[in-house]
Amino acid sequence: MDAFIQKFCEKYSLPIALSLQLLDNMEKFTFHKGDFLVQEGGRNSNFYIVSKGIWRGHYLNDGVDVSVWFASEGEAIFSSWGYVENTVSLVSIEAMCDSELYGISKAKLEVLYAGSVELANFGRRLFEQQFLGLESWMITGGSPRAKERYLTLLEENPELLQYVPLKHIASYLWITPQSLSRCLLYTSPSPR
C-alpha cells in the first residue's frame, strides 16, 4: 500500500477499504514546483489528497505574503471558499515542489457521501480537523516564543525545511526570517 494512503487513513480515521473506494473515484494530477491549484481570486471547488509533494496555502496582506498552512503526503487540500460556497478563493494554493494529487469534484464526492454513512462521517471529521488546524495556527501565532512555534512545526512537518523557502515558513510562524534563522541556529546540533 502507498505510504500516502496509510497517512491519510490515520489522519482522518478512515478505514483503508473506504479510502481505496474514494481513490477509485478520483483522478490523478501532476504539478510542478510553483504551480497553483487555485490562486487568490480564482475558483476551485474540488477536493484533493496529496500523494506526493508539499503544498502551501497563502494570501497577500497589504503586499505581504502570509502562509496559512502547509500540506504534505496523505493530507487533504481544497479551497474552503470554493468547496463550501463555490465562491472565489481568498487563499492561493501552491506546489512547493513537484507534486501529485488525487482530485474529485464536490458533486461527485457528495454522491459518495450520500451512499455511505462512513464516508459522510469522514467528511465531517475532515472539516473538524481543518477547523482545529486553523484555530491552532491562530493560537500558536500568539505563543510567546518563536522557538516553541518552530519546534512544534518541525515535530509535525520535518520535511518542510527540505522543500519550503524559509521566508514562507517564517510567515507561517508569524516571525521574521531573521528570527527563524536564530531558531535554526539555536536548535541545530552543535559541532563537536
Give the positions of each predicted feature.
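Cyclic nucleotide-binding regulatory module and flanking cytosolic helices
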Residues: 1-27
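Cyclic nucleotide-binding regulatory domains
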Residues: 36-97
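Polybasic "coupling" helices that flank or enter modular domains
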Residues: 94-177
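Hydrophobic residues at beta-strand termini and immediately following loops
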Residues: 29-31, 71
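Conserved small/polar residues in nucleotide/adenosyl-binding loops
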Residues: 186-191
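N-terminal alpha-helical segment
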Residues: 1-4, 30, 105, 146
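Amphipathic, Lys/Arg- and hydrophobic-enriched alpha-helical face
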Residues: 8, 31-37
